[in-house]
């Protein structure tokens, strides 16, 4: 036998008869205040205009309601939520790998790549990899990462200074706000 879940009244939007306050402040369709009325009086005004009485703020004293078309109001709220989600950007961590013996042109390519990532609002993890006995030259790798940090100064700031991680040395740069 299927179970029918009953929606709690709190989850439902407070419109028309669902507004349960002794007195409410009512705003007309054009934004002018009609004053403090009982929900029954306000509902009667809304029905005369063939519109709904929508609770905007129950935190105010007295609660604020507006006479409007609820379908239109709901659509606008959903549209605003969609726009907000669209504008949200999660900062990813993009990695730029190189060796400490990198040639000048290759280095410039990596800097341009990191610059593009920072402009897009992503963090950049600059990694210098070591092979075999190259790990003895960690000071050169640190100098390279510091040089990269100064080259990217206008676009980002060092979030984590150069440090060794196993056979790599890495540094984290976050975009400037």
Curated annotation (Swiss-Prot):
Identification of the protein by name: Translation initiation factor IF-3
PANTHER family in UniProt: TRANSLATION INITIATION FACTOR IF-3, TRANSLATION INITIATION FACTOR IF-3, MITOCHONDRIAL
Quaternary structure and interacting proteins, as annotated: Monomer.
Gene Ontology terms, MF aspect: ribosome binding; translation initiation factor activity
The organism of origin for this protein: Nostoc sp. (strain PCC 7120 / SAG 25.82 / UTEX 2576)
Gene3D superfamilies referenced in this protein's UniProt entry, alphabetically: Translation initiation factor 3 (IF-3), C-terminal domain (3.30.110.10), Translation initiation factor 3 (IF-3), N-terminal domain (3.10.20.80)
Coiled coil: none
Compartment(s) where it occurs, according to its Swiss-Prot or TrEMBL record: Cytoplasm
A GO CC term assigned to this protein in UniProt: cytosol
Function: IF-3 binds to the 30S ribosomal subunit and shifts the equilibrium between 70S ribosomes and their 50S and 30S subunits in favor of the free subunits, thus enhancing the availability of 30S subunits on which protein synthesis initiation begins.
UniProt-listed HAMAP family: IF_3 (MF_00080)
Pfam families xref list: IF3_C, IF3_N
This protein's UniProt keywords: Cytoplasm, Initiation factor, Protein biosynthesis
GO BP: any one term: ribosome disassembly
Similarity comment: Belongs to the IF-3 family.
